[in-house]
Curated annotation (Swiss-Prot):
Enzyme Commission number, as recorded: 2.7.7.56
HAMAP family membership: RNase_PH
Gene: rph
Statement: the UniProt record of this protein carries the keyword Endoplasmic reticulum: no
InterPro entries (UniProt xref): ExoRNase_PH_dom1 (IPR001247), ExoRNase_PH_dom2 (IPR015847), ExoRNase_PH_dom2_sf (IPR036345), PNPase/RNase_PH_dom_sf (IPR027408), Ribosomal_Su5_D2-typ_SF (IPR020568), RNase_PH (IPR050080), RNase_PH_bac-type (IPR002381), RNase_PH_CS (IPR018336)
GO BP term, example: rRNA processing
Name of the molecule in the record: Ribonuclease PH
Species classification: Bacteria, Pseudomonadati, Pseudomonadota, Betaproteobacteria, Nitrosomonadales
GO MF annotation, one: tRNA binding
Domain of life: Bacteria
Binding site for phosphate: R86, G124, T125, R126
Source organism of this protein record: Nitrosospira multiformis (strain ATCC 25196 / NCIMB 11849 / C 71)
């Protein structure tokens, strides 16, 4: 039995609230169980130097955690004067995931800046950030379309992410913090709505996992991502 009492193939409850903040072109609060993240997408009318004059846009992401988003207060990274390797890894993952469903040539020479700020953490913050940020980006693109700043949407499909793992020998979907801290294997999967794999990050924390375990985890992730994309579509239709 999982500590959360969920079935091995059961997601935590998911709630996506759009237009959560006033100023950003796209903003979302995503709640996955007790994990809560504010995702915003802002439009910047310029591109990085390496893209100037090339007629295409860019999307990049930043990620951070509030000091008391966890059980014990963390020092702000700004106070330390540098980002941790974990933070840099996660924000690059978010950017790659979102760019996988963008035709940046349709964006023009502008940048979508995504910010994912964890206000409460209970596992799965990087995967929830991707799932929520997609909706924020969708709304930011909607703003550009309404302003006639672009002629067509650059979004080519949906993308979402979920964690899977092996806990006490059983492959499981959507690990919370307690499960993640005790699992034998931890893996993050990013997929599109046509079930294309964007990224897999997996590590055996204790015993190595088998090919059969991997196949079972991929099946669980595919099921979970279908449900998460359905939640995205439901939020966008409200």
């Amino acid at each position: 039995m999982r500590p959360s009492k969920r079935r091995p193939d059961q997601l935590r409850s998911v709630q996506i609230t759009r237009h959560y903040t006033r100023h950003a072109e796209g903003s979302v609060l995503i709640e996955c169980g007790d994990t809560r993240i504010i995702c915003t997408a802002s439009v910047d009318e310029k591109v990085p130097l390496f893209l100037r004059g090339k007629g295409q846009g860019w999307l990049t992401a930043e990620y951070g955690m509030l000091p008391r988003s966890t059980n014990e207060r963390m020092q702000r990274e700004a106070a330390k004067g540098k980002q941790s390797g974990r933070t840099m890894e996660i924000q690059r993952l978010i950017g790659r995931a979102l760019r996988s469903v963008m035709d940046l040539t349709k964006l023009g020479e502008r940048t979508i800046q995504v910010d994912c700020d964890v206000i409460q953490a209970d596992g799965g913050t990087r995967t929830a950030s991707i799932t929520g940020a997609f909706v924020a980006v969708h709304d930011a693109i909607g703003t550009l379309l309404r302003k006639q700043a672009i002629e067509a949407t650059p979004i080519t499909g949906h993308v979402a992410a979920v964690s899977v793992g092996v806990y006490e020998g059983v492959p499981m979907l959507d690990l919370d913090y307690l499960e993640d801290s005790r699992c034998d294997t931890d893996m993050n999967i990013v997929m599109t709505d046509d079930l294309g794999l964007v990224e897999m990050q997996g590590t055996a924390e204790g015993m190595p996992f088998s090919r059969n375990d991997l196949d079972m985890m991929l099946d669980l992730a595919q099921q979970g991502i279908r449900e998460l994309i359905a939640a995205q579509k439901n939020a966008l239709n409200r």
